[in-house]
């Protein structure tokens, strides 16, 4: 009854959006309104029009359409609001690999196959525009804060990106953070062993997602702000605990404020909680930036400009003159959030699947201990000799892309995609979740099989994988800014854990599914057992 009541409440909130429309979601009228699905091979493989090509290019109006009312019915009544990634699967089966959907007055063209995604990504231009960060922009405008690298577009974005790129994107620069990350991993192992000792079995951690979230937050703060904030202490500082809580608050409520009409904001608690979460995040970031500014000023006063030693990322940004403190405050919290979710969720899913697949886990351990001598700590140079470890992370990101969908607007030209001609300023949605589980691209797409990414002696070699079948870090000039750091962080921690422990699922964990809290997260606690290995 409670579930039915919630469904009725959600439906009632749509108010004037459904009033007088005669909506009958499961009746004949709804069925008759569904367009014919676009054939997958026709949409995904239609070649682009070359010079002199006289074949007819179809228009936007000929695409199958998901009506706004039907979408709201799916999200709020059928319960897909926290399962929008699975809604991609449903809609692709119904409409084909390309369909139109609406949110308010905004039209979206959804792309759900690797060739279609590639076509758009390769034509993004110098200043790719994304229009899926509007909620973040509303908060920045509300508090008169500078936009960051995720919320800025055009030439301003390009300049900001260039300033932030210097110490993050180049592999050689990212490798410089190895010692800092290993320091945080040392603390993580201590905390993990404390939790194991506290468990009834003496070897169990009840909630790996939570522990890895604290690890990822500690690591990215140490890199960006050059300060340990105590996330892995047995007793976490109050300010840090409030910050951690506020990040969850912001993400959880952003799901609701994205789809609920604006007139509900004064009536329901979601909008205020969303703003409060962001306010705490920025307050925390501002305190860390202010502390670093005070350190820089103190160095200048004591040693002059020639005596200032650039120690890390934030120090470099503030002393280079490329970013003002206001601009740094706009971007660093955004980088922080991106870094936390990428590593914590991916590592949670990786450990979960390794626990379920002991043969793969044993092969990975053999690889790691064959490269890293007993008693030694993995270093960045070691991963050139660990193809299976890289494949485990790549396969995890294929199954669980951190962001299951994102969007781009092609602003400077019309574009042909799959035989359809789209005007300038068309907004495309990349449906990463369903694309990376496409059976035409990946054999047994729902199976965790890291060997598909290795070249020799694996069944997948009989099929050519499409390079855009899984693009978890994006592509081109707007690819993930922190990719190199995230990869290094995940490689270092996964290698250390496999080196030290045999992983097993806790008995109460069972089967874990994903839910979309903007990012893909487990729907329940992932409890694991860590049994020390004999070396």
Swiss-Prot record:
It is an enzyme of class 1 (oxidoreductase). Signal peptide: none annotated. It is a peripheral membrane protein. Pathway: Hormone biosynthesis; cholecalciferol biosynthesis; Steroid metabolism; cholesterol degradation; Lipid metabolism; bile acid biosynthesis. GO terms for cellular component: mitochondrial inner membrane. It is found in: Mitochondrion inner membrane. Interacts with HSP70; this interaction is required for initial targeting to mitochondria. This is Sterol 26-hydroxylase, mitochondrial. It comes from Oryctolagus cuniculus.
């Amino acid at each position: 009854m409670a579930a039915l009541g919630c469904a009725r409440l959600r439906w009632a909130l749509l108010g004037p959006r459904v009033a007088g429309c005669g909506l009958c979601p499961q009746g004949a009228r709804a069925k008759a309104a569904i367009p014919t699905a676009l054939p997958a091979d026709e949409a995904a493989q239609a070649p682009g029009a070359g010079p002199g090509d006289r074949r007819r290019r179809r228009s936007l109006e000929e695409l199958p359409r998901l009506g706004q009312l039907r979408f709201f019915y799916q999200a709020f009544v059928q319960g897909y609001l926290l399962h929008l990634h699975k809604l991609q699967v449903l809609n692709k089966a119904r409409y084909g690999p390309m369909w139109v959907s609406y949110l308010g007055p905004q039209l979206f063209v959804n792309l759900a196959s690797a060739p279609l995604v590639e076509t758009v990504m390769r034509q993004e231009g110098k200043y790719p525009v994304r229009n899926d960060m509007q909620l973040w922009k509303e908060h920045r405008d509300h508090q008169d804060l500078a936009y960051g690298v995720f919320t800025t577009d055009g030439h301003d974005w390009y300049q900001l990106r260039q300033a932030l790129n210097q110490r993050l994107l180049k592999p050689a620069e990212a490798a410089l953070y190895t010692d800092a990350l290993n320091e945080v991993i040392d603390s993580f192992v201590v905390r993990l062993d404390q939790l194991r000792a506290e468990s009834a079995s003496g070897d169990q951690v009840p909630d790996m997602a939570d522990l890895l979230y604290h690890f990822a937050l500690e690591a990215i703060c140490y890199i960006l702000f050059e300060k340990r904030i105590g996330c892995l202490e047995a007793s976490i500082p109050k300010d840090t605990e409030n910050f951690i809580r506020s990040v969850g608050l912001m993400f959880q409520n952003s799901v609701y404020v994205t789809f609920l009409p604006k007139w509900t904001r004064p009536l329901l608690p979601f909008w205020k909680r969303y703003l409060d979460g962001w306010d705490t995040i920025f307050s925390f970031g501002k305190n860390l930036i202010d502390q670093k500014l005070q350190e820089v000023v103190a160095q200048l006063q004591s040693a002059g400009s020639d005596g200032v030693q650039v120690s890390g990322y934030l120090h470099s940004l503030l002393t280079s003159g490329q970013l003002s403190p206001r601009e740094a405050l706009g971007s660093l919290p955004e980088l922080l959030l991106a870094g936390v979710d990428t590593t914590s969720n991916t590592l949670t899913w990786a450990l979960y699947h390794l626990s379920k697949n002991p043969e793969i886990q044993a092969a990975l351990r053999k690889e790691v201990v064959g490269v890293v001598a007993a008693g030694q700590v993995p270093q960045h140079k070691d991963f050139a000799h660990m193809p299976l470890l890289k494949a485990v992370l790549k396969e995890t990101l294929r199954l669980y892309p951190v962001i299951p969908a994102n969007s781009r607007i092609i602003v400077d030209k019309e574009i042909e995609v799959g035989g359809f001609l789209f005007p300038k300023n068309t907004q495309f949605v990349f449906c990463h979740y369903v694309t990376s589980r496409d059976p035409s691209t990946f054999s047994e797409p729902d199976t965790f099989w890291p060997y598909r990414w290795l070249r020799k002696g694996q069944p997948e070699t009989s099929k050519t994988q499409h390079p855009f079948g899984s693009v978890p870090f994006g592509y081109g000039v707007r690819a993930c800014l922190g990719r190199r750091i995230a990869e290094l962080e995940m490689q270092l921690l996964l290698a250390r854990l496999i080196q030290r422990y045999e992983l097993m699922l806790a008995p109460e964990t069972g089967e874990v599914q994903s839910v979309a809290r903007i990012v893909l997260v487990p729907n329940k606690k992932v409890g694991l057992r860590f049994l020390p290995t004999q070396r």
